[in-house]
């Protein structure tokens, strides 16, 4: 399993190198009401190198902190309507996502590919010097030709994100992830799996 702390630590190291002439950074975050996004948010709030976090979501994450700002956007495909509020950010953690269970390819593509790539294009136009980090998933299919629908869609998403003119664009493919004890957006069944997966697959786990 991947630890959220581990992922954010890697990204912070990247920022340390890229932003070596600056003391602090401002980041945009999506998915703060989900498990991964909430974990990234908590880590950013605790990290001294992060000056400000703008959480863009369809609903509030219900967390109050001096470093945190919220922008509620009902439709990410209309993000350009909020362009004035997106200026001056150094990075974006795109952690929003949906499960493919019960979805046909058209609907899943709209929610996973169309929404993500449009969101990123808007940001690249406003902040071309930004680093864009996309939380994808293990077994994502970069060839876009495999039999697994969700893997093809995520592969196309990664490929097209990488074409955008950001300062840097990074795709993370975690498998099963552990969580912070402080997190609230964790399903009970996930807590059970999080406790046993490292023991069952120790060579494939990072804790």
Residue ranges of each PLM-predicted region?
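Short, polar loop motifs at secondary-structure junctions
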Residues: 55-62
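Acidic, Ala/Val/Gly-enriched low-complexity intrinsically disordered segments
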Residues: 5-8, 13-17
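Conserved Rossmann-fold NAD(P)-dependent oxidoreductase catalytic core, especially the SDR/UDP-sugar
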Residues: 59, 98, 106, 110-156, ...
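N-terminal Rossmann NAD(P)H-binding glycine-rich loop of SDR-like oxidoreductase domains
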Residues: 27-46
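NAD(P)H-binding glycine-rich loop region in Rossmannoid oxidoreductase-like domains
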Residues: 27-28, 69-126, 139-141
């Amino acid at each position: 399993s991947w630890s959220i702390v581990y992922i954010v630590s890697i990204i912070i190291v990247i920022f340390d190198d890229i932003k070596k002439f600056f003391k602090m950074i401002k980041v945009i975050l999506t998915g703060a009401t989900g498990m991964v996004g909430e974990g990234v948010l908590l880590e950013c709030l605790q990290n001294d190198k992060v000056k400000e976090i703008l959480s863009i979501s369809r609903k509030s994450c219900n967390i109050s902190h001096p470093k945190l700002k919220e922008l509620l956007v009902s439709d990410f495909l209309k993000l350009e309507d909020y362009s004035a509020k997106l200026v001056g950010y150094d990075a974006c953690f795109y952690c929003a996502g949906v499960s493919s269970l019960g979805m046909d390819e058209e609907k899943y593509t709209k929610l996973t590919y169309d929404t993500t790539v449009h969101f990123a294009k808007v940001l690249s136009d406003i902040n071309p010097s930004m680093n864009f980090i996309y939380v994808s998933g293990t077994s994502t299919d970069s060839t876009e030709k495999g039999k697994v629908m969700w893997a093809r869609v995520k592969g196309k998403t990664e490929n097209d994100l990488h074409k955008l003119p950001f300062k840097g664009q990074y795709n993370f493919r975690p498998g099963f992830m552990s969580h912070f004890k402080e997190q609230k957006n964790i399903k009970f069944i996930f807590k059970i799996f999080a406790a046993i997966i490292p023991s069952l697959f120790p060579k494939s786990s990072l804790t």
